[in-house]
């Protein structure tokens, strides 16, 4: 490769890596916010630890299967579309969960004390399990795009840099959700 082409390649390589990091920070933000909201959901809606545990367990199982399934999908379709589509779908589900108590007038999801009925519990749980599948749409495109753009001799180093997105996303969500719950409540 000539110097001009090498310079362009490095530029796009780093740009791709940064975009993938931002995308995975957002995936982590959308995945870990539920954990940060658990105490508030338990206190304000009366959802039990057992119910929350079932949601989280099923979410984790579905997430594991989803990463496997979406690995095959990422090899056969647009990785960028899969990555972005998962972020959009997960955002929609997160907003639906966040505003699910506002659907009370339509679906009678809260009892007279303002606690969750089983309908609301099933709605939140089902949405979170579906979100588990959608979260599995994040890693396969990232891994595939990194392998496509980064030389094998540099891949481990660049993946180590990309892996910091997990910690950054988790840190941001805990800090932000903690502040939001303190400031605005559920």
Annotate each predicted stretch with a short phrase.
Residues 15-49:
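Extracytoplasmic
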Residues 32, 60-68, 170-171:
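Residue-level signature of mid-helix packing/kink "hotspots" within the transmembrane helices
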Residues 40, 71-72, 179:
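Membrane-interface helix termini in secondary transporters
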Residues 67-78:
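Helix-to-loop junctions at the C-terminal end of transmembrane segments
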Residues 88-117:
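C-terminal ends and interior cores of transmembrane alpha-helices
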Residues 127-166:
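Cytoplasmic helix-loop-helix junction between adjacent transmembrane helices
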Residues 162-186:
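Helix-loop-helix hairpin linking two adjacent transmembrane segments in secondary transporters
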């Amino acid at each position: 490769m000539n110097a001009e082409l090498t310079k362009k390649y490095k530029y796009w390589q780093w740009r791709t890596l940064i975009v993938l990091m931002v995308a995975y920070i957002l995936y982590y933000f959308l995945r870990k916010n539920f954990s940060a909201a658990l105490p508030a959901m338990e206190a304000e809606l009366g959802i039990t630890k057992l119910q929350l545990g079932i949601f989280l367990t099923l979410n984790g199982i579905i997430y594991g299967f989803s990463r496997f399934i979406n690995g095959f999908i990422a090899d056969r379709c647009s990785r960028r579309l899969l990555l972005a589509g998962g972020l959009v779908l997960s955002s929609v589900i997160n907003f639906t969960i966040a505003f699910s108590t506002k659907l009370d007038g339509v679906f009678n999801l809260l009892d007279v004390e303002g606690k969750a009925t089983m309908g609301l519990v099933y709605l939140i749980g089902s949405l979170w399990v579906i979100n588990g599948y959608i979260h599995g749409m994040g890693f396969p495109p990232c891994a595939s795009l990194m392998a496509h753009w980064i030389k094998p001799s540099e891949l481990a180093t660049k993946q180590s840099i990309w892996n910091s997105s997990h910690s950054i996303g988790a840190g941001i969500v805990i800090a932000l959700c903690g502040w939001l719950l303190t400031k605005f409540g559920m």
